[in-house]
Amino acid sequence: MTKYIFVTGGVVSSIGKGIVAASLGRLLKNRGLKVTIQKFDPYINIDPGTMSPYQHGEVYVTDDGAETDLDLGHYERFIDINLNKYSNVTTGKIYSEVLRKERKGEYLGATVQVIPHITDALKDKIKRAATTTDSDVVITEVGGTVGDIESLPFLEALRQMKADVGSDNVMYIHTTLLPYLKAAGEMKTKPTQHSVKELRGLGIQPNMLVIRTEEPAGQGIKNKLAQFCDVAPEAVIESLDVEHIYQVPLNMQAQGMDQIVCDHLKLNAPAADMTEWSAMVDKVLNLKKTTKIALVGKYVELHDAYLSVVEALKHSGLANDTAIDIDWVNANDLTAENVASRLADADGIIVPGGFGQRGTEGKIQAIRYARENDVPMLGVCLGMQLTCIEFARHVLHLDGANSAELDPETQYPIIDIMRDQIDIEDMGGTLRLGLYPCKLKPGSKAAAAYGNQEVVQRRHRHRYEFNTKFREQFEAEGFVFSGVSPDNRLMEVVELPDKKFFVAAQYHPEYHSRPNHAEELYSAFVTAAVENAK
């Protein structure tokens, strides 16, 4: 029988529910259990695919092409699993599906209501997360905080799950803030008590509290919360601020969190062996060397817009025994006049993805600087497309070369829309999304990075492609297409072999990076940056 764990939040948002859920997932996986995890987002958007990165941070793409919340990146990196489209559910997605069924007459003329139709659809997503992965445990995080109007159908669905599958198969974990008032010199439990009261008013009694705090709470505070919130004292778990998020699973294990969960759910599983994870964390905290990477982006004010890129760089730093110092460079501010001085201190330059015109000329200046000064450079998605445009302008001398996305009237559309996308007007869900194979060119830097594999599979999120009409011109000047689709129609990876490392990929390598296994192309880039720093 599959077990279901529901993680809710109270008092404030952004309290770290996702890290708590991911940490628990890692602990249960290391006990030998098969775990999957999902995020419920109560907003009305179908998915975050068309949301501004300033609103929501990065869009995380799964193998099957779902555009999802950035928390899924945490889940995959912590637990080292690949999730699917059932791992991110929004209000908009649920209502869209229910309304589509209503229009088709699938409800046989019934009055369609929040209960049972919306709640049943939500429960179906929870159960499908289990059946599509054959998991022992499903962990579901609900976004927002208890008391939000938009969360009510989600919490009702969670309440009903207990009756549907039995109390021994369901566990509710509530994450709250335990504020510390410096003036009074004490921690305040009332916000947590009121949050639990609100949750109980909706029919959910939490089985465990996870309290986010800056200072150790002490047993007295835990006993007080246990008494007034009706949970066992040992089931009040501290989530202290830490130097690195990968410390959290170890802190949770030290407090017996995973054992309490297993006892409640009657899971007979051996203790989690966290030796490898602990060694990784110890290494992260004791790196002596630092490598400076300039990240040239258009959303650099919000670092979460590049969360997976940053994590992949850190993982690659770990693989190369170096800490990564990210220099956040706003592409909008880069010009031909200031690019050399702005990037002079960089050991390596990364140009990540993005959409739209803003900042593209600055990114092109950064790419040109990297090429002309032989600074290791990695381009990703739009970064790959702009790498091609920069080469066309300054090496092939195709003045005005551009992407048809950025300049529909360009004489040289180096990047053009995919043929099957020409008549599509909707923006959402119309990209090339998900896992696709890439055939690597033997002897190339890309092939070397991937251990000379013939084919790798990586996730994509883009609409435009390199225009193969220009391929021969590029190759005549030493530009190598080192990764292509198996049918040779789509250009996936490009590089200049005479440079230390000048490689760009149309796909998003960062989605495959894990703390205990850095993504290979990122790792090769950081290796080159480390060498460049010497």
From Swiss-Prot:
Signal peptide: none annotated. Pathway: Pyrimidine metabolism; CTP biosynthesis via de novo pathway; CTP from UDP: step 2/2. Residues 292-534 form the Glutamine amidotransferase type-1 domain. GO terms for biological process: 'de novo' CTP biosynthetic process; pyrimidine nucleobase biosynthetic process. Keywords: ATP-binding, Glutamine amidotransferase, Ligase, Magnesium, Metal-binding, Nucleotide-binding, Pyrimidine biosynthesis. L-glutamine binds at residues 54, 354, 382-385, 405, 463. UTP binds at residues 13, 188-193, 224. Allosterically activated by GTP, when glutamine is the substrate; GTP has no effect on the reaction when ammonia is the substrate. The allosteric effector GTP functions by stabilizing the protein conformation that binds the tetrahedral intermediate(s) formed during glutamine hydrolysis. Inhibited by the product CTP, via allosteric rather than competitive inhibition. InterPro entries: Class_I_gatase-like (IPR029062), CTP_synthase (IPR004468), CTP_synthase_N (IPR017456), GATASE (IPR017926), GATase1_CTP_Synthase (IPR033828), P-loop_NTPase (IPR027417). It catalyses: UTP + L-glutamine + ATP + H2O = CTP + L-glutamate + ADP + phosphate + 2 H(+); L-glutamine + H2O = L-glutamate + NH4(+); UTP + NH4(+) + ATP = CTP + ADP + phosphate + 2 H(+). One of its GO terms (molecular function) is glutaminase activity. The active site is at 381 (nucleophile), 508, 510. Its EC number is 6.3.4.2. Catalyzes the ATP-dependent amination of UTP to CTP with either L-glutamine or ammonia as the source of nitrogen. Regulates intracellular CTP levels through interactions with the four ribonucleotide triphosphates. PANTHER family: CTP SYNTHASE, CTP SYNTHASE-RELATED. This is CTP synthase. It comes from Streptococcus thermophilus (strain ATCC BAA-250 / LMG 18311). The lineage of its organism: Bacteria, Bacillati, Bacillota, Bacilli, Lactobacillales. The gene is pyrG.
